[in-house]
């Protein structure tokens, strides 16, 4: 199974229009040097079984960037919570300016399913409306990069620069789409394990990076004792980025220095 680096942001659709979320997210990618490449529609072939058991069809398209943004917006609006949305998804494909060491480039070019290192620079962006325990609904903005090449193989200094690029994207996304919460982590921790902890007043130690917007911060009061191993960065709107550096205590340099 391909290893991905995952990042998700939760946006309140009553506070930020869906059109602005899609446009803001795509603008954020462009702002850090990403290039739009294509779209992919994924559809479950057999909707009578759980999605994890179904076979899927994948249709790649190459519309213009503006057409892709329009289609992603219509797709988000057309899949309300409780619909059969889980059986269809729509991805926007971008190419990020990740760095690869020469040994990794050779590895990628020798890979039977890759042959070209630019394939490992490809990332996916998608949007879905979902239920939320604190709000009625939330828009989930989902970003994925190819973790095993971007962060695992090659020189640690190269990995660090690639991760800093992803964090630049995270801040650009945060600034443009105004989420109340977000998380980012590697393939072995590729799910949100911190939101419920924050709502319960516990420190979000499960994910490497957590983003707390001003609305959520006001709701929970940030009376959470973060404890050792978590450092914070304040954002211009009063939000915070929490970095669980205790996960990788020897990683240098630190991200918030």
For each feature predicted by the language model, list its residue ranges.
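Well-ordered, non-membrane alpha-helical segments in soluble/globular domains
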Residues: 18-28, 68, 156-173
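A short secondary-structure junction signal
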Residues: 154-155, 185
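Short, glycine- and small/hydrophobic-rich beta-strand elements in well-ordered beta-sheets
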Residues: 39-48, 178-193
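Short, extreme N-terminal segment that most often corresponds to the first beta-strand
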Residues: 1-47, 51, 253-257
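Structural alpha-beta junctions
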Residues: 29-37, 164-183
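Short beta-strand-to-loop capping motifs
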Residues: 7-16, 54, 58, 145-147, ...
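Alpha-helix capping and helix-coil boundary motifs
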Residues: 17-18, 48, 52-57, 61-68, ...
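Aromatic/basic-lined ligand-recognition segments
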Residues: 60-147, 164-167, 171-174, 186-257
